[in-house]
A protein has these predicted regions:
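Alpha/beta-hydrolase superfamily serine-hydrolase fold, recognizing
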Residues: 27, 31, 35, 42-49, ...
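A glycine/proline-hinged amphipathic helix-loop "lid/cap" segment
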Residues: 1-96, 324-325
Length: 325
């Protein structure tokens, strides 16, 4: 098993591409002891399963009922909020003394079917004061009412606005938001919209069957069936491919990716990082030993969670330094 910060390669991270199925019953990597109580609590919450599209609205309602109030996040990180139209909230440190060093546009998780602009905004919000970030968090349209094409278009519109004044912009996303960020990053490349970088935290890149998808088929944080149904809803009528299935990755800005060794998306993320390197893209990959999907948002004070936060902080700091050099 890989340790903090190692990129994965070799026989313990085998990716099954295309429509091939995983037929073996691979051994399931262990969740770190310090994270098990949080995972057990997720299981006790009994979020509705997503067996098919008819379960999506029930899942979305349950997700909304469990969501943290926006005021809680703003108070935790001492953030000031200003609305920028109907779909964007701009978060800045309340005592920001000067213009932000870096603008971060954030896309929330929720499987492309649930969530709000504040869900997971700690990803960048926790660093807003220290690193002088301006965080734009987006309420993008959700499936099945909107498809993946519409989501990408909505994000691209915001990114055109965010980059219009020449400010350095990092596009960041967590889980489903990370996958959407990867797709929107490709759209920016094609449209000539310049981004400073992409920060993809445990991104939901595709619905392929991989070893890790089989290992965590029934995971309490996000399982294989839910992933397949969510992607089916998002891709209905959409011309866009999931970013994990795209072959044309050259020309992207620097990319940060991370994943847990004990999560469903692990192998898709590791494979994506390898293909970024093959395409000549500057990519940084971390595989967090014993972490499950989004565990750093559940048990923030765990050693492995603190390591994940520190790695993201370091990468954002590097982006800020590059922007002013």
């Amino acid at each position: 098993m890989r340790r903090h910060g190692d990129h994965a390669s070799g026989d313990d991270h085998v990716v099954v591409r295309g429509s091939a199925r995983v037929t073996a019953d691979p051994a399931r990597p262990a969740v770190a002891a310090e994270l098990r109580a949080g995972l057990a609590e997720l299981a006790r919450r009994e979020m509705p399963g997503i067996a098919d599209a008819s379960d999506i609205e029930r899942y979305r309602a349950a997700s909304a009922a469990r969501a943290e109030p926006p005021e809680t996040l703003r108070a935790r990180w001492r953030l000031h909020a200003a609305e920028r139209g109907e779909a964007v909230t701009v978060l800045t440190a309340s005592r920001a003394p000067r213009p932000a060093a870096l603008r971060v546009v954030f896309l929330h998780g929720g499987g492309l079917i649930a969530g709000t602009r504040y869900a997971g905004a700690d990803l960048a919000g926790r660093f807003a004061e220290e690193l002088e970030l301006e965080v734009w968090t987006i309420e993008y349209p959700l499936a099945p009412a909107a498809n993946f094409d519409a989501m990408i278009a909505a994000v691209l519109d915001v990114l055109r606005d965010a980059t219009a004044d020449g400010a350095p912009v990092v596009l960041a996303g967590q889980s489903a938001g990370g996958g959407l960020a990867a797709a929107a990053g490709l759209a920016c490349r094609d449209a000539g919209v310049k981004l400073a970088g992409l920060l993809l935290a445990c991104p939901m890149l595709d619905a392929r069957d991989t070893v890790s998808a089989a290992q965590f088929a029934d995971d309490a944080s996000w399982d294989r069936r839910s992933n397949a149904v969510a992607w089916e809803a998002a891709l209905s009528g959409s011309a866009a491919q999931p970013p994990g299935e795209r072959a044309d990755l050259a020309g992207l800005p620097p990319v940060f990716l991370d994943t847990g060794s004990a999560e469903v998306f692990r192998d898709s993320i590791v494979d994506f990082a390898g293909r970024l390197w093959a395409a000549g893209v500057n990519a940084e990959l971390h595989v967090w030993d014993g972490a499950y999907h989004s565990s750093d948002f559940v048990t923030e004070d765990a050693e492995v969670s603190r390591a994940a936060h520190a790695a993201r902080r370091s990468w954002l700091l590097g982006m800020s330094a590059s922007a002013v050099s």
